[in-house]
Amino acid sequence: MRVLIKNGIVVNADGQAKQDLLIESGIVRQLGTDISPQLPCEEIDASGCYVFPGGVDVHTHFNIDVGIARSCDDFFTGTRAAACGGTTTIIDHMGFGPNGCRLRHQLEVYRGYAAHKAVIDYSFHGVIQHINHAILDEIPMMVEEGLSSFKLYLTYQYKLNDDEVLQALRRLHESGALTTVHPENDAAIASKRAEFIAAGLTAPRYHALSRPLECEAEAIARMINLAQIAGNAPLYIVHLSNGLGLDYLRLARANHQPVWVETCPQYLLLDERSYDTEDGMKFILSPPLRNVREQDKLWCGISDGAIDVVATDHCTFSMAQRLQISKGDFSRCPNGLPGVENRMQLLFSSGVMTGRISLERFVELTSAMPARLFGLWPQKGILAPGSDGDVVIIDPRQSQQIQHRHLHDNADYSPWEGFTCQGAIVRTLSRGETIFCDGTFTGKAGRGRFLRRKPFVPPVL
């Protein structure tokens, strides 16, 4: 199969040029002006459009069981939505397994979830829900098998204490793995939540009030210090929602610590006023939405390079699930928002088209840096000879209003309903195969491949 994309502006993290792009057998073979292939091929005219590397979303939760509910997107509907939004690779955060289970247990479960369903290429982050000698011994074997990042939680049922965190950080560092962490102070949250529940204050706005930004920022600072104690272990903070936590990360970098951070579109574009609407339960997620001042601080980090990655934390529970389970009580509502289909378009519209970020920075945030950090570079995250032919074509001239009835996930609502975006995703190619074109999904379940990722190496830019 040969595909020639002509007349577009090809953009990588290190530059852009108007040139053609030739893909053969799923691999980029040539970039240049006026490419004339000697053999027949499909031609795609990208005149007036940008040709980007396919998006790499390193934070999704498909088919996750959170105890009170299972998310309504599985690895078909979730990756279908990703494909229609210009994302061609996902790394899914595996959910907790049975109490006392080995790391391999969840990997086998999740590979079963994704096989025969995933539309795009995929990998997983391991999850460390308890620490013992068997778990620590298992980590290097998992890295050898292509799982080079693992997640720790400082909140929820399987939160780790400081001693367990230190043990995990040391072994992951020694094994060539990157530690990712959900940082919130669980004890402080539990105290605040109990106060509100005792007072009968269970409306959605009290979800945000029970998880103030200081709970997140304190946990970020603690993880930074523990990583330093653990031998300057590399650390990746997921779903940052506030500026104070970003300040701590800036300080750590000034002290030459290997720390990286992601944020998500919801923290850049939605705010805590959503909790006071009639549909406030739609916006329950953790960390919660913050105020506009915190948004502005995050946008500064996006613009000046302090934030490395924009992912989604896509974790979809339908409004029907939320209402049935919660009965209007925030503390009983399953947490998470949909968004894997909207990430690329939202950041392009609100970042590039407003002048906040360059085209190159857009690529860095959405594909290049995620691929570098998580062992996929240069197979993913770049359009260059030898890389996978993963492409998203965006037409900046088109304006679109987001409406859930046009989306491809399995939810019954979108938090982005009514958002108007400048710039439209017109085509997505995965390894040279068109899987989305002009509003129509054309991929097939099961075509996605499991990606064995390389051990962690700090990116050199």
From Swiss-Prot:
Pfam families documented for this protein: Amidohydro_1
Cofactor comment: Binds 2 divalent metal cations per subunit.
Gene Ontology CC, one term: cytosol
Superkingdom of the source species: Bacteria
Family in the record: Belongs to the metallo-dependent hydrolases superfamily. Hydantoinase/dihydropyrimidinase family.
PTM (free text): Carboxylation allows a single lysine to coordinate two divalent metal cations.
Catalytic reactions on record: D-5-phenylhydantoin + H2O = N-carbamoyl-D-phenylglycine + H(+)
Cofactor: a divalent metal cation
E.C. code: 3.5.2.-
GO molecular function, one term: metal ion binding
Name recorded for this polypeptide: D-phenylhydantoinase
Extent of the signal sequence: none
Sites where the protein binds substrate: 156, 286, 335
Oligomeric and partner information: Homotetramer.
Chain positions recorded as a divalent metal cation 1 binding sites: 59, 61, 151, 313
Keyword Amino-acid biosynthesis: no
PANTHER family tied to this protein: COLLAPSIN RESPONSE MEDIATOR PROTEIN, HYDRANTOINASE/DIHYDROPYRIMIDINASE FAMILY MEMBER
